[in-house]
């Protein structure tokens, strides 16, 4: 959520920057109307309440003096009715303004490339050499099915499309990656490990920006009005909702493993095979709470931490600086890390690393004090995948495949795989 005072005094500037996102700003124009009416109603209500108090005191004086107060009593009733009507209108206007504020996306940072679609994203850097095969490489779903380590068909029978059973060495590889990533981020990168709930309430989804705009993308448990988490970002960020932190606590860095659940409502027909786009998948998420002046330095560090996973796995990748039209709803700046997938002949996203500045913190009311009695300020929040496990499995299977259909296990994972060197 944007700062309403900043929006009020910089309306045209904010509008111009939001236009770079390619957003429909039809409703945005209502801000000035609603904000002005709200302030008018507040003034009118306070004036009438003050008058009501004044008349009430006059009535008390007349009654003490045994004088007729009927005219003033009628006047006070009329004032009371007007106050009631204005309070009702004020409540409606404030609710409309709140809904509008929750629907306005974040302002892009000045360093985000201006553009409309993913075609306008900018390559920040690449790492590693794309492997040249002397045979026709297979897609990971064929490799895994032939090896008996992933079972899409039975998962489809048990649940439906976009689900999978991991079996044998496939399950072991998934578990190895989870442990490897958590060990790296906690032991070397300084994050504290968190194992979060997989269900959250509506306030949590609103705090991180999934609601109200993207409710159709979420799995909801209607009987409790809980949501299955689309990412560990949601519960971990909301750990500190409605809290005031001390500056000594910052930066706070969490690494959280969780399963994630997404309806993929807008992805019909895309990536229908394999692990790239599943309704349920595992991920290690990195979440930070930092002082505002440190957030862009911390974004670079967070992105480097996610990159380190791919470097140790020796998987070629590139880092994309996302343009203003491809930032998503909540980010002020975002990097996507894309890993090379041979069967696609291109790079595919395996991590998004974002700086939300105070956008989430304002929605979730997460603040800090620089001094013991100082005025609370909103923290800046950041998060990034470190990494998406299923897509990492897909990248390993495809990049490490051999002509005979076996898979070489990356050296860094072998201690987690019981010393095995090959999946066969």
UniProtKB/Swiss-Prot annotation:
One of its GO terms (molecular function) is serine-tRNA ligase activity. It is found in: Cytoplasm. InterPro entries: aa-tRNA-synt_IIb (IPR002314), aa-tRNA-synth_II (IPR006195), aa-tRNA-synth_II/BPL/LPL (IPR045864), Ser-tRNA-ligase_type_1 (IPR002317), Ser-tRNA-synth_1_N (IPR015866), SerRS_1_N_sf (IPR042103), SerRS_core (IPR033729), tRNA-bd_arm (IPR010978). It catalyses: tRNA(Ser) + L-serine + ATP = L-seryl-tRNA(Ser) + AMP + diphosphate + H(+); tRNA(Sec) + L-serine + ATP = L-seryl-tRNA(Sec) + AMP + diphosphate + H(+). It is an enzyme of class 6 (ligase). Pathway: Aminoacyl-tRNA biosynthesis; selenocysteinyl-tRNA(Sec) biosynthesis; L-seryl-tRNA(Sec) from L-serine and tRNA(Sec): step 1/1. Its EC number is 6.1.1.11. ATP binds at residues 262-264, 349-352. It holds the Pfam family tRNA-synt_2b. Keywords: Aminoacyl-tRNA synthetase, ATP-binding, Cytoplasm, Ligase, Nucleotide-binding, Protein biosynthesis. GO terms for biological process: selenocysteine biosynthetic process; seryl-tRNA aminoacylation. PROSITE patterns: AA_TRNA_LIGASE_II (PS50862). L-serine binds at residues 231-233, 285, 385. GO terms for cellular component: cytoplasm. It comes from the Bacteria. Consists of two distinct domains, a catalytic core and a N-terminal extension that is involved in tRNA binding. Homodimer. The tRNA molecule binds across the dimer. Belongs to the class-II aminoacyl-tRNA synthetase family. Type-1 seryl-tRNA synthetase subfamily. This is Serine--tRNA ligase.
């Amino acid at each position: 959520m944007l700062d309403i005072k900043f929006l009020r005094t910089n309306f045209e500037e904010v509008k111009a920057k939001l236009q770079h996102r390619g957003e429909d700003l039809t409703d945005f124009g209502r801000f000035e109307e609603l904000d002005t009416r709200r302030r008018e109603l507040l003034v009118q209500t306070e004036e009438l309440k003050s008058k009501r108090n004044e008349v009430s005191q006059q009535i008390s004086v007349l009654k003490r003096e045994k004088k007729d107060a009927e005219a003033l009593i009628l006047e006070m009733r009329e004032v009371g009715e007007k106050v009631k009507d204005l309070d009702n209108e004020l409540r409606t206007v404030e609710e409309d303004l709140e809904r509008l504020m929750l629907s306005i996306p974040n302002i892009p940072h000045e360093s985000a490339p201006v553009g409309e679609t993913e075609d306008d994203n900018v390559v920040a850097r690449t790492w590693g050499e794309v492997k040249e095969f002397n045979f026709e490489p297979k897609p990971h779903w064929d490799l895994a099915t032939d090896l008996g380590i992933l079972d899409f068909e039975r998962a489809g029978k048990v649940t439906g499309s976009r689900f999978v059973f991991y079996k044998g060495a496939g399950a072991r590889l998934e578990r190895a990656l989870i442990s490897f990533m958590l060990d790296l981020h906690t032991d070397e990168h300084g994050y504290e490990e968190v194992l979060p709930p997989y269900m959250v309430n509506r306030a949590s989804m609103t705090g991180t920006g999934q609601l109200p705009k993207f409710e159709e993308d979420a799995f909801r448990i209607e009987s409790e009005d809980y949501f299955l988490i689309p990412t560990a970002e949601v519960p971990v960020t909301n750990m500190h909702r409605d809290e005031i932190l001390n500056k000594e606590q910052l930066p706070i860095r969490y690494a959280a493993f969780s399963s994630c659940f997404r309806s993929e409502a807008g992805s019909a027909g895309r990536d229908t095979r394999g692990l790239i786009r599943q309704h349920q998948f595992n991920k290690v998420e990195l979440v930070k709470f930092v002082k505002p002046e440190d957030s862009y330095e911390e974004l670079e560090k967070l992105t480097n931490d996610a990159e380190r996973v791919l470097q140790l796995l020796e998987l070629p990748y590139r880092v994309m600086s996302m343009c203003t039209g491809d930032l998503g709803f909540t980010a002020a700046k975002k990097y996507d890390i894309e890993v090379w997938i041979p069967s696609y002949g291109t790079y595919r996203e395996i991590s998004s690393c974002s700086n939300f500045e105070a956008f989430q913190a304002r929605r979730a009311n997460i603040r800090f004090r620089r001094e013991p009695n100082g005025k609370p300020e909103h923290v800046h929040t950041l998060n990034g995948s470190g990494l998406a496990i299923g897509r990492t499995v897909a990248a390993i299977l495809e990049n490490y495949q051999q002509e005979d259909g076996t898979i070489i296990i990356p050296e860094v994972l072998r201690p987690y795989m019981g010393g095995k060197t090959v999946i066969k």
